[in-house]
Regions:
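Eukaryotic small-GTPase/lipid signaling interfaces
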Residues: 1-220
Length: 220
């Protein structure tokens, strides 16, 4: 069904975006720990070359920073990996695995990749897959809701609080840059899947429309 939907949409949207996703079997056979570790290594490299001055960059330029590119890619990759599966049962397995990865990322204090995955799981193309979500265990759905609530920003309209938090970010940056990940082993085959690939065929809005159309074809 997923392939049929893809070919149907290929006739509707030309050119169609390239999709580099693993099969459900390969994706879930690789432990969630491995994905969490590789994402952490990629994030460490991206943030290691960033500068505090980038926090004041205007939105269009900020979107091109290494950490933003990685965030957007991971979120899109999560959506595409789920939608590439042919039946609700397989999609549920993949969704469950992503929740496990997000849980481990939270434990590793890698909020960047954690937020990217959670935003993908709560995006319109994925959230609407009722049949898929009904096959995800209650414990995992509860874990997802808990993680998502932890990332909410209840004080985002409080200027004083926001300023205080920003100052803490500035002061803590040297400490985080000094953290070593030498104990983590790079796995090229996994990083190849996770590294950003630039889409020139469709803009982000077009890609979002594309994935939503795939979602509605899979589960009307």
């Amino acid at each position: 069904m997923a392939l049929k939907a893809w070919y149907w949409l290929k006739r509707k949207l030309v050119p169609v975006p390239h999709v580099r996703v693993p099969t459900a079997a390969f994706f879930t056979d690789v432990k969630a720990t491995v994905y969490a570790e590789q994402l952490t290594l990629l994030d460490a490299a991206a943030f290691g070359c960033s500068d505090i001055s980038e926090l004041g960059m205007p939105f269009p330029e900020a979107e091109q920073s290494p950490d933003s590119v990685l965030f957007n890619h991971l979120s899109e990759w999560t959506v595409r990996t789920i939608l590439a599966q042919s039946c609700p049962k397989r999609r549920a397995r993949v969704v469950s695995h992503f929740i496990d990865i997000a849980t481990l990322l939270h434990q590793m204090r890698n909020v960047h990749s954690e937020a990217a995955i959670l935003s993908a799981l709560s995006s319109a193309p994925i959230e609407r897959l009722k049949d898929t979500w009904s096959r995800v265990t209650k414990s995992r759905r509860r874990s997802f809701r808990t993680l998502w609530e932890l990332l909410c920003c209840p004080h985002e309209t409080d200027t004083d609080c926001s300023t205080s938090k920003m100052e803490k970010v500035f002061s803590s940056k040297p400490f985080h840059l000094s953290v070593s990940f030498d104990h983590l082993r790079v796995r090229p085959s996994i990083q190849h899947l996770l590294e950003p690939c630039h889409f020139t065929e469709l803009d982000p809005v077009g890609l979002g429309t594309f994935t939503f159309m795939v979602s509605t074809e899979l589960e009307p």
